[in-house]
C-alpha cells in the first residue's frame, strides 16, 4: 500500500531534521565558558558553509580560548556613565589636546593629504587617535580572535559579534589579520581601534605602500578613520559640534554621548590652534 501524502511529508521532515549536523544544534550562545568549545566547532562548520576555508578556520581557532578578561571589560564599562567633565578628566582630555597640537604640526603634510582626500580635518582624527590608544601608545593585549569569538558566543550581543567574527575570519583569509594578533578587549584593531567589520569596509592604504596596516602605520590608521567618518556622512568644511552637520559622523564612531562630545571638544581645541 502506498503512503498517504501527509505521512510522506512527516517522514520527509523527520529525515531533514536528522540530517542537520549535531554541531549546528550546539551553536547556541552561553553565559559561561562551559559551552564555548562546542560553540566554536559549530561556528567553524557554519563559517565553512559561508566560504571560509577549513585551513583558515583551523589556523584561526588553533589557540582560541574563552576570554574572561573580555567578559569583565564588557560588563564593566563605567566611564561612559560619567559626566562630560569627569570623562574628560579620566581620559586625559587636556593631555590629548596638548599632544594633539604637537602631532598636528609634526605631521602637517599627512593631515593635509587626508583632509584633501576625505574632507576630515586633523582635529577629530587626533582626538580619536589620542582617546583610543594614546596616539598608538597602547593598542591592547587581548588575543583578538579569542575576544571576538567570546563575545560572539556570549548571549548579551551574540548576533552583533557573530557578524564581527565573520569579518575577522575574512580578514584572516585575506592575510590582513594575523591569527596571533592582539588588541583591545572587544577585538578592536589598530591605532584608532577599528572593529573587524569596519576594517573590511573602511580600511585604506594611507601611506601608499600597497598594503593595509592599522597597527604599524599611523597613515593607514588615520586615513581609514577619515574614510569611516566620510562614510558616516562627514561633509568637507562642515562643523562637528553637537547640533552641527558632522556631529552625526562622530556618533557613528562611538555610541556613547559623553565620548562623542569629548571628541568634538578635543578636536575643536586642536583645530583651533
Report the location of each language-model feature.
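Bacterial N-terminal signal peptides that target proteins for export
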Residues: 1-11
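Hydrophobic alpha-helical segments
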Residues: 9-10, 23, 44, 112, ...
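C-terminal segment of classical bacterial N-terminal signal peptides
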Residues: 17-25
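Cleaved targeting-peptide boundary
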Residues: 24-33
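Mature N-terminal segment immediately following signal peptide/propeptide cleavage
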Residues: 32-54, 58
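Catalytic glycan-binding domains that act on GlcNAc-containing polysaccharides
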Residues: 52-273
Amino acid at each position: 500500500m502506498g503512503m498517504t501524502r501527509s505521512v510522506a511529508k512527516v517522514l520527509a521532515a523527520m529525515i531533514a531534521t536528522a540530517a542537520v549536523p549535531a554541531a549546528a544544534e550546539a551553536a547556541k550562545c552561553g553565559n559561561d565558558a562551559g559551552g564555548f568549545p562546542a560553540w566554536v566547532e559549530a561556528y567553524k562548520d557554519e563559517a565553512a558553509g559561508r566560504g571560509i576555508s577549513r585551513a583558515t578556520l583551523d589556523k584561526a581557532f588553533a589557540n582560541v580560548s574563552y576570554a574572561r578578561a573580555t567578559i569583565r571589560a564588557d560588563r564593566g564599562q563605567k566611564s561612559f556613565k560619567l559626566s562630560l567633565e569627569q570623562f574628560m578628566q579620566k581620559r586625559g582630555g587636556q593631555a590629548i589636546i596638548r599632544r594633539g597640537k604637537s602631532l598636528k604640526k609634526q605631521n602637517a603634510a599627512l593631515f593635509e593629504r587626508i583632509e584633501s582626500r576625505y574632507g576630515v580635518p586633523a582635529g577629530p582624527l587626533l582626538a580619536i587617535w589620542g582617546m583610543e590608544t594614546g596616539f598608538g601608545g597602547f593598542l591592547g593585549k587581548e588575543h583578538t580572535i579569542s575576544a571576538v569569538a567570546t563575545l560572539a558566543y556570549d548571549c548579551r550581543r551574540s548576533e552583533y559579534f557573530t557578524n564581527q567574527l565573520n569579518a575577522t575570519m575574512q580578514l584572516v583569509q585575506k592575510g590582513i589579520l594575523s591569527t596571533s594578533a592582539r588588541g583591545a578587549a572587544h577585538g578592536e584593531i589598530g591605532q584608532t581601534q577599528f572593529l573587524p567589520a569596519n576594517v573590511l569596509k573602511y580600511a585604506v592604504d594611507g601611506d601608499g605602500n600597497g598594503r593595509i596596516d592599522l597597527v604599524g602605520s599611523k597613515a593607514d590608521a588615520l586615513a581609514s578613520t577619515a574614510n569611516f567618518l566620510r562614510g558616516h556622512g562627514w561633509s568637507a568644511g562642515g562643523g562637528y559640534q553637537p547640533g552641527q552637520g558632522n556631529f552625526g559622523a562622530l556618533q557613528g564612531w562611538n555610541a556613547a554621548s559623553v565620548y562623542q562630545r569629548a571628541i568634538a571638544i578635543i578636536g575643536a581645541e586642536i583645530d583651533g590652534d
